[in-house]
């Protein structure tokens, strides 16, 4: 896999992204970009480097979450690498959902082309009018009329929906507002070309629209899809989101470690190659200490993520949720700090178009909001810790000893 990235992905990356800047239609990959991307994907397939993220040996490589952790950390060093192995978000989470709970018909129509890397997909959770980190707040409605779901509502920051290759959205909707709070939601498959579905605009991130994938604002007005498009049955939306978001969160953190590694390499390279006041700038101020702290933080993050991955393998996603929240609250924040330190040692170049660091920083900063903001994950961890204390007589006695 490392050889594939070095020989087939790194050499095409600069040309791929430069071509994107020249596109007349920024939401479509041009022929040369597709040629470069498909060439790298075909080489990955030929080498058996495909769908590593799926633990099912029939549809993926049969790797554990712990196995995949090492791979994803390497993929994180080049943003294009994951797509060449068909391991890109949000497709990975959507494929895992379809693989686990999709009907044979849903798998044939949507999972099969996703597994083959023929189409892309998106996931519709976040809404502009409510605090969407609490899934109970989701207000987009789906009413069953005859044999069709009629869907109304808005979603925004729907990652990847701007890409012309994106054909299907898994959408979180409210199907029964009178049910118990965690049984009100369902998830429904909505083709993006369905009448009534409108891509209103790309939402910007730090002023950038991130074409060609983007984060789109979507409005649905009387969108109709067949009754059979519901996933796993009505009222299962919250359970599906946990199936999907658990692995997704840890995959993001795995890739973040790769980004932190790359930032540290860039920091050291800059420090050794530039002089000021008669010295290499690596030897000025606290730069050596910064390098030390960065390496320590990277190794701490790596061990935490590996522990969370092992917990998922042994305990299951639900029982490992506290460990997943630990790494999700920890890793993007620390990766941001390491990238920020790398920017600082680069000076003005660190925030310019001549450096990959600005884009790296933006992606890590987004992760502190995506798939649950830091505060939600800290709350999950703290709640578990308080509950553990209250159930432990040993801890209570020890804390009261003088």
Enumerate the language-model features and the residues they cover:
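Alpha-helical interface subdomain recognition
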Residues: 1-82, 88, 101-106, 113-118, ...
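Short, conserved phosphate-binding/catalytic loop or strand-edge motifs used
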Residues: 88-95
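Flexible, glycine-rich active-site loops centered on histidine and acidic residues
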Residues: 95-101, 123-124, 178
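A short, Trp-centered hydrophobic/proline-enriched beta-strand micro-motif
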Residues: 117-126, 170
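Short Gly/Pro-enriched turn/cap motifs at secondary-structure boundaries
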Residues: 129-133, 159-164, 177-179, 205-214
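Flexible, small-/acidic-enriched active-site or ligand-binding loops
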Residues: 137, 195-224
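Short, surface-exposed charged micro-motifs
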Residues: 139-141
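A short core secondary-structure module
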Residues: 148, 152-200
